[in-house]
Amino acid sequence: MDTFNVPMLAESSNTNYATEATSNHHHLQHQHQQQHSHQQQQQQQLLMPHHHKDQMLAAGSSPMLPFYSHLQLQQKDATATIGPAAAAAAVEAATTSANADNFSSLQTIDASQLDGGISLSGLCDRFFVASPNPHSNSNMTLMGTATAATTTTTNNNNNNNTNNNNNNNVEAKTVRPSNGNSVIIESVTMPSFANILFPTHRSANECIDPALLQKNPQNPNGNNSSIIVPPVEYHQLKPLEVNSSTSVSTSNFLSSTTAQLLDFEVQVGKDDGHISTTTTTGPGSGSASGSGSGSGSGSGSIARTIGTATPTTTTSMSNTANPTRSSLHSIEELAASSCAPRAASPNSNHTSSASTTPQQQQQQQHHMQSGNHSGSNLSSDDESMSEDEFGLEIDDNGGYQDTTSSHSQQSGGGGGGGGGNLLNGSSGGSSAGGGYMLLPQAASSSGNNGNPNAGHMSSGSVGNGSGGAGNGGAGGNSGPGNPMGGTSATPGHGGEVIDFKHLFEELCPVCGDKVSGYHYGLLTCESCKGFFKRTVQNKKVYTCVAERSCHIDKTQRKRCPYCRFQKCLEVGMKLEAVRADRMRGGRNKFGPMYKRDRARKLQVMRQRQLALQALRNSMGPDIKPTPISPGYQQAYPNMNIKQEIQIPQVSSLTQSPDSSPSPIAIALGQVNASTGGVIATPMNAGTGGSGGGGLNGPSSVGNGNSSNGSSNGNNNSSTGNGTSGGGGGNNAGGGGGGTNSNDGLHRNGGNGNSSCHEAGIGSLQNTADSKLCFDSGTHPSSTADALIEPLRVSPMIREFVQSIDDREWQTQLFALLQKQTYNQVEVDLFELMCKVLDQNLFSQVDWARNTVFFKDLKVDDQMKLLQHSWSDMLVLDHLHHRIHNGLPDETQLNNGQVFNLMSLGLLGVPQLGDYFNELQNKLQDLKFDMGDYVCMKFLILLNPSVRGIVNRKTVSEGHDNVQAALLDYTLTCYPSVNDKFRGLVNILPEIHAMAVRGEDHLYTKHCAGSAPTQTLLMEMLHAKRKG
């Protein structure tokens, strides 16, 4: 997300808040102005080197926005009514006795400075004059009636410590606690921010939500209660629409504008890896909180409730600790941190001390600094990961949000937890789930001393957006003012956790080795990276001793450096990315390109899971993939067949028109992937827990796959569409589970394309030179779609396709036909057909004995499976060869006879010709390809319903895994083909019916003596009838 620091200006040069006063007072005020002016210049100088050129243009075309503290606004109002001297005294007293909110350092924007139409760098929606949002941050401070106050002192110099290190990249969005685990900041319970209302500020309605807020660490001396939080920088809050007729008052918190947090950073000092709270409530008030941790990365949120009886809340953090930020230099660390288990989530009974010794602070600071660049897989001469502006955000659960789109949207954690809390009304699970939220929420879940704004909240978290299970927290206790307490949140059901490790198991487009990172324009291995760098820096000139067409792979990449270097250039490696001065580090201009590619990979994964879950739900309970069999998992220990994804190229910006083959092409032959468009599809999102009971309505349960889950509140309820869980209503608890989008669509760029790009892959033709290739029948619907189109095939399907040798099949076929008719005047064509089928059966047996799943079975089980599937596979083989290899209907033999090749697929029954053509047309309409063919062949072979199988469990596991791989493959590579998986599965019974008729015909011929005996074909016919 594009963010940049706007210098905090003290007050505008043409404004004077003090009128006639004593000369001493005027002199002090003049010094104060000069001091702030000097700080402003320093901040601008420090800011300049971090600006991207687009930001510089935006900053140059937009006026700098002055910010005023509320104490100055109070002095301005007081001056007009009670005089300058009394006003200065009142402000000084307010400075030493600030209210319990400790927002003395909060800067707001006055509406008169904005003219109702200024936007920062064009990234936020234009600001409009609206009622201020009096919500405070539930994680930062607790707002109550100002009957008691705490002494705070604002140190403006701290702005320099917390505001000048923003490099506007993904590195600044992580912190590294003492336990070493990286935490994505977007997963922290997200706060809601707004201006603070002051009774003495009569022009409150003229203020708007700030575009930039900054909260400095405080050092109060309160002992009754404390909230320990890291200093937080907030950037770019987008104001939401609100009813203009709604009145704004401190008693009606939830009726004003609420801001959407688009980007923020957290700096952690000392040993603060989490937030701890201790809350003191007034008499008659109740407070309850619970925490739940997801099976993946979800953590429980904290609910706090403060009564109307003088709460004391302080914010404490030592200013001596110099906060540092950890860095992520690769997508591997980003995904690893999102998958890694987090530190234990604090609950309401956990209290952390704010006092640490200077030695501990120094140790923590040294630990965080030393860990800044650990774990990065980029070598020192790689391109530095310059994360410039492009309008993308990645949340903790891999969600993707394009903030440049005209459609407001969100992806990430679903609803969950309880009803609204005191400050922003968001549900606990929704906060803990991660992701971005649009928050106009309403009243709280239960009353407290008659105050509807101080409700109890159940914080049963529902894990992450992928549906991890969460444990429900206890509901709130009812106060004297209202007998209804919050109900307990129920645990969420476990879903499949997203595994991002497969994103990095890609193959080098040059040699096929495993990639190590982005090098000189695209993902390559370490060997090709070093070879390319040495060639360019040393200006080497190679020659090829062959025909300049040497095959380059992992085993022989060093044989011909000429052809290897040419292939590096062909796949898209950039000469200009290599530094001629031999200095370490790459060219920063490629940084945005790398970040854009990483963000799209996570977006692809999210969309893949959503679509796959939707299809599985529509298919019902029939499709239930089981874990991979031990034998297959041992052969591929790092494989996740359900979530495999391959993106071999960065984007069209990093490659030439004739660009790199995909990883499947490296394994199976060259592929022209320049025209096919694909998008990945989702996995199971799980089911979220139920929210706590609302003030006037019971709890609601949101299902991870519900299309429109809503609560039972008596006000307008917010619903989750698409594949999201139900949202919480104004007066009711929120439902849980799923990934939520406000319109059910995941959009790309600024257009309205749905989550499944209407850019399918053409049929994969099996030619003499390649196993898989695209046709250009379909095209991507947008430029953004074209950037993420390379073929993504799971390793299982790649392994299946490698086991098929169509060239050998056709060679053996025509060789047998010519051999049988050599020096023969005339032959029996039916007998010749039986010999060809017998040869095909031998080929089937040889193929099956060397395939995964099948080779682990005992011989008896193998024979039973082959005896019940051979005819179906023969029909499918012939359909495949007609569609993909252009097998003709007939061929002329050496003796001049015409042999009907189609009879091989009909098993000698000419009456089935029309039926056979109908099946072929159905498969072609479904864009039947090699991946579909091998999966369907395995589904026919691994039939767990065959009687007499001893190791039925292995067969069933293999069948389910293949079925899941086919489902994932069809959704991944053919999103534009409706119900392709269902169509392919439905064709299998039709093939079987046709094969049964062919078997009966062959058996009849055999009994009549017209067919040859003592052949494998006849043995199969008899064995099936005996069984």
UniProtKB/Swiss-Prot annotation:
It holds the Pfam family Hormone_recep. It is found in: Nucleus. Its main location: nucleus. GO terms for molecular function: DNA binding; DNA-binding transcription activator activity, RNA polymerase II-specific; nuclear receptor activity; RNA polymerase II cis-regulatory region sequence-specific DNA binding; RNA polymerase II-specific DNA-binding transcription factor binding; transcription cis-regulatory region binding; zinc ion binding. Disulfide bonds: none annotated. Residues 792-1024 form the NR LBD domain. Residues 36-48, 300-324, 335-349, 443-461, 697-721 have a biased composition (Low complexity). One of its GO terms (biological process) is mushroom body development. Keywords: Activator, DNA-binding, Metal-binding, Nucleus, Receptor, Transcription, Transcription regulation, Zinc, Zinc-finger. The keyword Metal-binding applies. It comes from the Eukaryota. One of its GO terms (cellular component) is RNA polymerase II transcription regulator complex. Expression in the parasegmental primordia of the embryonic blastoderm. Changing M583I: 10-fold less binding. A zinc finger (NR C4-type) spans 508-528, 544-568. Residues 24-35 have a biased composition (Basic residues). Belongs to the nuclear hormone receptor family. NR5 subfamily. Monomer; forms a complex with ftz. This is Nuclear hormone receptor FTZ-F1. The gene is ftz-f1.
